[in-house]
Amino acid sequence: MLNPGALGVNLVVEELETETKFLIKQVECIDEHHANKALEELMPLLKLQHPNLSLYHEMFIMWNNEISSLFLCLVMDYYSQGTFQNIMENKRKLKAVVDTEWMHTMLSQVLDAIEYLHKLNIVHRNLKPSNIVLVNSGYCKLQDMSSQALMTHEAKWNVRAEEDPCQKSWMAPEALKFSFSTKSDIWSLGCIILDMATCSFLNDTEAMQLRKAIRHHPGSLKPILKTMEEKQIPGTDVYYLLLPFMLHINPSDRLAIKDVMQVTFMSNSFKSSSVALNMQRQKVPIFITDVLLEGNMANILDVMQNFSSRPEVQLRAINKLLTMPEDQLGLPWPTELLEEVISIIKQHGRILDILLSTCSLLLRVLGQALAKDPEAEIPRSSLIISFLMDTLRSHPNSERLVNVVYNVLAIISSQGQISEELEEEGLFQLAQENLEHFQEDRDICLSILSLLWSLLVDVVTVDKEPLEQLSGMVTWVLATHPEDVEIAEAGCAVLWLLSLLGCIKESQFEQVVVLLLRSIQLCPGRVLLVNNAFRGLASLAKVSELVAFRIVVLEEGSSGLHLIQDIYKLYKDDPEVVENLCMLLAHLTSYKEILPEMESGGIKDLVQVIRGRFTSSLELISYADEILQVLEANAQPGLQEDQLEPPAGQEAPLQGEPLFRP
């Protein structure tokens, strides 16, 4: 005879022919009606088939003449390896933590068995450590499933509770009032998990008092969870989520078994179990994810790691970080932290929403860190750059994603040293394709132009072919957005840098000149634009007489020379603008055919004034002297304005509406 259970006596018997041992549970019944009702409820259990359920082999009713009582006898397999209760008792004596791998293995089997029962709408009703038997060191089974009729025998329960108060401590609050459901099994399972997690620091009495306390005071659980965290009990992060929702006083607020399995097996420590592998295809419920993500940034990152394969968890985690107050983000983030987040997100590179949120987070983290400290070093590892480029390629039609990625790249490139790496990643060709696809989208165009401006400043060696194609698209963008000041400013800078690299084709020269002059006229007050436009014009005029002719020649009352004089009046106290202006004029004077036009346009007088104002700028004086020397040497009667022809072999500029007014 074994120790009696809550409802009856347990006998170990042996079959004479096979010498096979069985366990017979004898449950005393009130009367024949009570016995028959319990038997009727339990008969369907004979048909159950699950590897982690100790099934009933036979059920019968017998009369005991000695005590004049009727008994329901339940025959099941006998296992001599002990139960979970024996394991917990041994661990308590040693004050030892339950082996993590063993616990994961056993818990996966228990959960799988309970899920099987609950899918059939069968309630175990009697879950506790002593009813989880060990077949061997890595294999367990649930036993002693009960019926409503047996579990609602109040008089018997009261007697047993007085004999052994521990028996009822595993039961849910509503089960003590004889109301059972699948959610009462969840409570009992939560108590078992709690017992396994605390056996190293709570003795039997303390553990039982805790189980009783949480029925009436849910707050009793929090100090224990805190202690588990302090003692670094393995799996505490999962217990923090599971136990409050399994041990909720209101049954309807408790997790269902499938939710318990999802939370448990989707953490990284459970991925090796067969049940866990099956669970990878299921989604984590939103409310569970939200509870997981409560807390500080470190907690959120732990969740991202533990549920790295779950896209729905990653999306909510990233969005949580996006909305987190700045003082909680822990800025600036080191490169290692960014790489950790990106490594997780790379698993979900096909999911647009995740990529969009992640790139938005990068934009926020990098942008705010730079705003706090302009001298702060921006993370720009190969992993980060590769991720951003892969993201651009993965969803080339998403306006929002493309725009955000280029903004992030612009921040990273603001400190230089990545032009070569981005060139190797094919950035210039990709930028050309994106400009072509989104040339009507002002924000995307501006983001791309701003990035190119930053990159081309320190580019060393380049393959000219993609940049030559890129220059054509830049001119198209400027022509598409003729009144946009910011696009004009960024576009002028890019065209200047491309001209320095020799990446503007001769067939594009005239169009580029028109766009640069038009941009100056559109935005004369933007000093960056004016400087870069003058530099671009000077760079092109240095190599092309056609460019020089196009700048100088009158066209229906308009001339670039008049615009140059107007800009000087506006910036006569700015030596940088005046120096770039003189550099352009110096290159123009290298073409003899246009010298008369420059003379008649008042350039000589203008340069003389400039030379007198900027006596301390050696570079500027050098340009001025060069211009004056050429103009004075050629001060002779020349062609009249109406006789001036374009250089040999070149077509005259197209006639049309005047671009510039004197």
UniProtKB/Swiss-Prot annotation:
Q: Where is this region: Disordered?
A: 639-662
Q: Which PROSITE patterns match?
A: PROTEIN_KINASE_DOM (PS50011)
Chain positions recorded as ATP binding sites: 2-10, 25
Task: Show the coiled coil region(s).
Answer: none
- Does this UniProt record's set of keywords contain ATP-binding? yes
- In its keyword annotation, does this UniProt entry include Nucleotide-binding? yes
SUPFAM superfamilies on file: ARM repeat, Protein kinase-like (PK-like)
InterPro entries, per database record: ARM-like, ARM-type_fold, Kinase-like_dom_sf, Prot_kinase_dom
Q: Name one GO molecular function term.
A: protein kinase activity
Domain Protein kinase: from-to ranges: 1-202
One matching Pfam family: Pkinase
Q: Which domain of life is it from?
A: Eukaryota
Keywords linked to the UniProt accession: ATP-binding, Nucleotide-binding
Domain text from the record? The protein kinase domain is predicted to be catalytically inactive.
Q: Which family does it belong to?
A: Belongs to the protein kinase superfamily. Ser/Thr protein kinase family. STKL subfamily.
Please state what the protein is called.
Serine/threonine kinase-like domain-containing protein STKLD1
Species for this entry:
Mus musculus (Mouse)
Q: What is the lineage of its organism?
A: Eukaryota, Metazoa, Chordata, Craniata, Vertebrata
Q: By which gene is this protein encoded?
A: Stkld1
